[in-house]
A protein has these predicted regions:
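Active-site-proximal beta-strand elements of phosphoester/diester hydrolases
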Residues: 228-231
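N-terminal beta1-alpha1 cap of cysteine-dependent amidohydrolase-like domains
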Residues: 1-125, 136, 143, 147-181, ...
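Active-site loop->helix "elbow" adjoining a glycine-rich segment at hydrolase catalytic centers
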Residues: 129-131, 138
Length: 278
């Protein structure tokens, strides 16, 4: 498949901070990994997914001569996957609690990836943490903990239910996201986050908000290339029999892949269709 798109996925990072009882060997090493659902979501006909290992030159993660710009030059698009909190230091704050310290090493790595792909005009899509990282990279800030800092907030995370935690979102009328779902003013999405966008970056516009608390759920860049972030996990949208009004992730994926094909200059195969609202 010489014409296959090559989509990079940012890595989660496991840091062996302290010995884990009952574990050893590989768990004493720094690990780069991804959750398989996000890879399976990206893998479509004529699309290959590759995890991009961190190439941090300072701190715990070291690299040779390869740079993030080399990946951006070779790959056709970037998915910033979910995971651990963003460190408050990445947006000019200090942690309000030790549990909200986040991962500064991963922040630097993913911000570098983000900047490299944007500089190349390659499309970028952010999922959950990835959406928050886009906002931070462009100058915005976050709620370190929505329940603590926003009294009117609904439940955005339930560890016991995880991806089975759903709530309603409203699509902003006239937005490109709304255009992907004709006739859909609101829908259900899964919700697995306790942080969220507080101050929106100047170059972003809001495309979806949570109902009824108004927490920002989707953003898009006003710049020249494709850049979209969503607070939910489209790769986890699987419980359709229980949530028939959930937002189908296929139109968003198709738009992202179309942007990658346009940037590369290749024709598109048949669009993905998963079968939910939209």
């Amino acid at each position: 498949m010489s014409d296959a798109l090559l989509i990079g996925i940012s890595a989660r990072i496991y840091h062996p901070v302290a010995p884990v009882p009952g574990f050893g060997g590989i768990f004493n090493k720094t690990l780069h990994y991804l959750e398989q659902s996000v890879a399976h979501w990206v893998l479509q006909p004529h699309v290959l997914a590759l995890m991009i290992p961190p190439v941090e030159r300072e701190g715990l993660v070291q690299a040779g001569q390869m740079s993030l710009a080399d990946y951006a030059e070779r790959l056709d698009g970037l998915v910033l996957q979910g995971g651990t909190d963003i460190a408050p230091e990445s947006y000019g704050e200090t942690p309000l609690a030790p549990d909200w310290s986040g991962d500064r090493i991963r922040d630097r790595y993913e911000i570098g990836l983000f900047e490299a792909f944007v500089a190349q005009g390659k499309p970028v899509i952010g999922i959950c943490r990835g959406c928050q990282l886009i906002n931070v990279a462009l100058g915005g800030t976050l709620y370190q903990d929505i329940p603590t800092q926003l009294d009117s907030a609904i439940a955005h995370r339930d560890d016991a239910r995880f991806e089975s935690q759903f709530h309603e979102v409203s699509l902003v009328a006239g937005s490109r996201l709304a255009a992907l779902y004709p006739g859909v003013a609101s829908a259900e999405i899964n919700s697995i986050h306790h942080q969220g966008i507080k101050v929106l970056a100047p170059d972003l516009e809001v495309e979806a908000v949570a109902v009824p608390d108004g927490v920002i759920e989707a953003v898009r860049w006003r710049g020249p290339s494709y850049l979209f972030g969503m607070q939910w996990h489209p790769e986890f949208m699987v419980q359709r029999q229980f949530h028939p009004n959930q937002l189908d992730g296929a139109p968003i994926l198709n738009e992202f892949l179309a942007a990658a094909r346009t940037r590369r200059g290749v024709s598109a195969p048949s669009a993905v269709r998963l079968g939910a609202v939209g």
